[in-house]
């Protein structure tokens, strides 16, 4: 293919053109995909903020028939911690220090529901084979937290095996409620409650309002569009020649 442009000739090779078109379209696709991800994050941020500002729901007085109505809402509950079972979520970092999130089953008063409560962060300690120092709360208490799905975990480098550190203290690589229910023989509700910082009976809780991260995706989108533009310029420059040099 030859296209005359004044005293210049644009004459790209077929194989070069094919590769250029493929990667150009790929970069454009990835750019728009990142913009779509940014929009999703923006929508979630708006949803989260709205839910977080709504009135606290008392789980003792409200039947959980539709979990989507409770998701990311602040909730309160009166009941007892089942302290004989402590779940440690491994590989959690706070201020650059390795540690665990401590989850404890919580039986809601006058209800069959038992929730895993994320009570916050504790350091691992000097010996990973020993349980960290834990607090034990006896008797009936009232807690406040955020109603949410079990936390997502990235790619695991090892299987999610249950590691017993001592009687009643088990370490997991991820929170999979069905697996924890099987291990503890407790019929757990398939959602968790993350204890609010102002609520008692917890550990270190540096929870932060979720950042939507939309600006990160927008930045990535600009990068992909920049790659597409750069590819187009390189393709054009490398395939244009003066008349008589073709």
Region roles according to the model:
Residues 65:
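Phosphate-centric recognition/catalysis
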Residues 1-62, 73-246:
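Surface-exposed, charge/polar-rich loops and edge strands
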């Amino acid at each position: 293919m030859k296209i005359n442009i004044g005293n210049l000739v644009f004459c790209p090779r077929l194989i070069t053109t094919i590769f250029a078109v493929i990667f150009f379209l790929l970069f454009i696709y990835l750019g728009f995909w990142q913009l779509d991800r940014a929009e999703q994050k923006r929508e979630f941020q708006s949803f989260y903020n709205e839910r977080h500002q709504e009135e606290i729901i008392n789980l003792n007085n409200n039947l959980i028939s539709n979990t989507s109505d409770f998701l990311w809402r602040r909730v309160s509950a009166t009941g007892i911690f089942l302290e004989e079972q402590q779940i440690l979520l491994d590989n959690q970092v706070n201020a650059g220090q390795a540690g665990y999130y401590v989850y404890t089953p919580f039986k809601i008063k006058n209800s069959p529901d038992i929730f895993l409560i994320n009570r916050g962060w504790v350091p691992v300690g000097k010996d990973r084979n020993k349980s960290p120092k834990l607090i034990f709360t006896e008797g009936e208490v009232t807690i406040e937290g955020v109603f949410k799905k079990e936390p997502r975990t990235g790619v695991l480098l090892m299987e999610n095996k249950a590691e017993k550190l001592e009687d009643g203290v088990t370490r997991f690589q991820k929170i999979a409620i069905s697996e924890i229910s099987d291990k503890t023989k407790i019929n757990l509700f398939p959602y968790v409650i993350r204890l609010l910082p102002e609520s008692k009976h917890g550990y270190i809780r540096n929870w932060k309002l979720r950042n939507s991260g939309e600006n990160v995706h927008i930045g990535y989108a600009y990068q992909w569009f920049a790659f597409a533009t750069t590819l187009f310029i390189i393709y054009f420059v490398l395939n244009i020649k003066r008349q008589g040099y073709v």
